Amino acid sequence: ESIKDIVEQEEEIFERFYPYARLDITYTNERDMFAQLLVDSIDLIMSTRKLNAEETSYLSRRQSEPRHFAYATSAIALIANRNAADTAYTYEEMVSMLGDSASGRIFVIENVKSGITEQILQLINKPDLPGHFYALASKKEVFEYIKAHENAIGIIDYVAIGDSDSAFTREVLAQVNLLALSRPQDSIQYGFLKPYQYNLQDRKYPLTRELYVINNTGKSDVGIGFASFICGEIGQKIVLKAGLLPTYQTERNLEFKNSPDIKVVK
């Protein structure tokens, strides 16, 4: 669900290029999605993590060899009310606030079973989210809550607001603040960073995460075709346009002349 925006864009262009191919995509939370993959209810998933060792071992015992296709680097983005006093935090400050309600901050997420939740639990080293976390039904509700509450911080995938050409993105970012974070214990080196595309390179922004297609069919089918499309030139340009960092970056040649214009020649 958290990466629905990029998946929908890839699906639309894929079916436009291959009109006889039809994808049946269901959006759900990451925890349930992996559970369904393990019992063969679904053949292909798009997720923010690889299969872990336990899941891989389970599938191997069933003679299944799933294939992973990395296609983008995204990030967990933090947003706050426009009137919030602070717009930048050290990594250590943010992890402390996530794990301890004493700060008085409320954290708002889209789904308690999402991949974002799993990553937060790893950060704070706890089995469950603390009481100062609220789970809402949609990203739209998260945005509305942040606009109405000065002490709240929303946690979303950056893909939801990464496309700078999107009217929706411009509207949201005009009403909330995108927070900046330092890297762990080295804020002097890089300062405070927002999850912009250029900060995803080399993982300068501390809350980056990879996006994967995982296919469990073991055969060449429409799912493999879709994964190949996403990792190919067109699919990677869609990733770039969405504000994320493509895993496979195509070469672009620029021609410079004695003029103020720059021409892309390839």
State where each predicted segment sits.
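Exported/periplasmic ABC-transporter solute-binding proteins
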Residues: 1-19, 23-26, 38, 67-72, ...
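Pocket-flanking alpha-helical
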Residues: 31-62
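Generic hydrophobic, aliphatic-rich segments that mediate packing or membrane embedding
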Residues: 33, 72-74
